[in-house]
Amino acid sequence: MTFYGYRRPDGRVGVRNRVLILPASVCATDTARIIAQQVEGAISFNNQQGCSQVAPDQQFTMDVMAGYAANPNIYGTVVVSLGCENCQMDLVVKAIEERTNKPLKRVIIQEVGGTLKAVEIAVRYAKEMVAEASMLQKEEFPLSELIVGTECGGSDPTSGLAANPAIGAMSDLVVQAGGTSILSETSEFIGAEHILARRAINKEVHDRIYEITSRFEAHFHAVGEDVRQGNPSPGNKAGGITTLEEKSLGCIHKGGHSPINAVYDYAKQVESKQGLVIMDTPGNDPASVAAMVAGGAQVIVFSSGRGSPVGHPIAPVVKVTGNKITFANMEDNIDFCAAPLIYGEKTVEQLGTDLLNMVVETACGKQTKAEALGFVETAIARVCNYV
């Protein structure tokens, strides 16, 4: 099986061909938004960080920004900074250039004379990049070039019974084809980490799985909190999930049955052709998806039993539910229904194949529901993490 995409100068393959207007901090976010609105083919996002952060939080922010620019769905990036933030322009540019050699421009609002002049300059840069991007021709690539991120949010019991197993079957097929699948949400490994650890390819990966789950809980204990106070969420409980351990046993199904080859820290660059890997992310959906996209995922596959509209500005998000009522009620948000597994109408293998076909169609350019609606939520994790 193959898909059509865009080869980048750094060797990676994109499934979208966009220009990113990257705000280096919250103070540059609205300027970046104005720029992107004036250039068809450009995108931006709401960056609430970038200044007044402790060092580990600032590193998370830097990794996400650099990863967004390096993501192969991006042709090139125009970085917009205010000029006095902690995430200084030279630091942001250096972080991006360490990950990729794609086109890169910079605009500092305070240096060019304010918002209007910054917009004028950046719009010109962005239009030049969009024109260059439009000249690229799609090429055919094997699935080994694909990095798929997996996520679940607004879970109910059907997530663990149908949607996540279907995603896991799809994940196994990607791995078998030589591609990469990312299993995320460390908070939802708790109580099931021993099951994941048994699938580790070596002792280092085995120990890292225990390390990230222990560290996640320790972050909460340090401020007198217990992750179980916020997870499962009220929506999870209303849907029928009773404990974090129960939720975790459903969450890990997204990783299928493949060996776990590596564990990556939050938003670090994931190598292609890696098979199944784990990324240390919170359970908060936008913050977790942000990390996987920063890691290089071109497509996100996201299950939700209760229903979720979350999208992303850079990577298409394929929504999956195992709840036929949710699919009927939120059909404008959900792309794929895995409920036939519960009713014995299809096997998990059949659903995995169907879902992979949808992922390939998405990679080839078909819009997801979240893309069509223009949903571009994003968030960045912090030291005291989201549950």
Language-model-derived ranges and their functions:
Residues M1-E151, S155-V299, S303-V387:
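Metallocofactor- and cofactor-centric catalytic cores in central/energy metabolism, strongly enriched
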